[in-house]
């Protein structure tokens, strides 16, 4: 059975363009023109993932995310944000979106991000044998998907979890931007912009929320490294 994607956007041209592209690439596509219609469709005929615009009438994309997450629903969500609105991107992640894509975007990038998001959603057959990974007082369990810093639990989206998992699996090893983008997002497009920087900043905010020392460091011009002290 094809993977079912719900596309939610109040712009008819955007909806139809995404429907054609996703259908051409083997997905089954449903359309909604606002957040209220989207929630009704999700309740009646649940899709496998959602592409969700932020700015919409009646009920915006952020509120859709919040309502789904407040009920414990972990439906994979990719939000579409205004190109230059960093606050909108952060708000999307705060609301519980798994990933974001600024408009205008290349269709190839949206398809790559959707593949990566669905891949992160699919359980790994060998995951049951994985042991929890630790670095300093940071712990990540690939099976239960629980993350803690000391005794403090940390809630992460799928993308944040995948990024932290890559870092903690390569302690004290500098990882290049291109390698991280390829492994976590499945691509390294020039249009990716500052997606990686946004997610690193978000992980830092969550792992340092109670004043803990920084573990995720920038290696200027190269990438990032997980270590106790700055490089």
Swiss-Prot record:
The keyword Phosphoprotein applies. The keyword Transport does not apply. The lineage of its organism: Bacteria, Bacillati, Actinomycetota, Actinomycetes, Mycobacteriales. Phosphorylated and dephosphorylated by MprB. Residues 130-228 bind DNA. Residues 4-118 form the Response regulatory domain. Member of the two-component regulatory system MprB/MprA which contributes to maintaining a balance among several systems involved in stress resistance and is required for establishment and maintenance of persistent infection in the host. Functions as a transcriptional regulator that recognizes a 19-bp nucleotide motif comprizing two loosely conserved 8-bp direct DNA-binding motif repeats separated by a 3-bp spacer region. One of its GO terms (cellular component) is cytosol. It is found in: Cytoplasm. InterPro entries: CheY-like_superfamily, OmpR/PhoB-type_DNA-bd, Sig_transdc_resp-reg_receiver, WalR-like, WH-like_DNA-bd_sf. Keywords: Cytoplasm, DNA-binding, Phosphoprotein, Stress response, Transcription, Transcription regulation, Two-component regulatory system, Virulence. SMART domains: REC (SM00448), Trans_reg_C (SM00862). The gene is mprA. Its main location: cytoplasm. This is Response regulator MprA. One of its GO terms (molecular function) is phosphorelay response regulator activity.
């Amino acid at each position: 059975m094809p993977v079912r994607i719900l596309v939610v956007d109040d712009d008819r041209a955007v909806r139809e363009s995404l429907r054609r592209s996703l259908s051409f690439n083997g997905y089954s596509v449903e359309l909604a023109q606002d957040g209220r219609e989207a929630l009704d469709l999700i309740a009646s005929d649940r899709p496998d993932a959602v592409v969700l615009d932020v700015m919409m009438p009646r009920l915006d994309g952020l509120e859709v995310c919040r309502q789904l997450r407040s009920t414990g629903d972990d439906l994979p969500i990719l939000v579409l944000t205004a190109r230059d609105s960093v606050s909108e991107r952060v708000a999307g992640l705060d609301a519980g979106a798994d990933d974001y894509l600024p408009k205008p975007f290349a269709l190839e990038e949206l398809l790559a991000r959707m593949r990566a998001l669905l891949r992160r959603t699919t359980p790994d057959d060998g995951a049951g044998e994985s042991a929890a990974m630790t670095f300093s007082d940071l712990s990540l369990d690939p099976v239960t998907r629980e993350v803690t810093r000391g005794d403090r639990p940390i809630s992460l989206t799928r993308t944040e979890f995948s990024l932290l998992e890559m870092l903690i699996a390569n302690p004290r090893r500098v990882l290049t931007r291109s390698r991280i983008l390829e492994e976590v997002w499945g691509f390294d497009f020039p249009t990716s912009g500052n997606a990686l920087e946004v997610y690193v900043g978000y992980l830092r905010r969550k792992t340092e929320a109670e004043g803990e020392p920084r573990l995720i460091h920038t290696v200027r011009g190269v990438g990032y490294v997980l270590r106790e002290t700055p490089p």
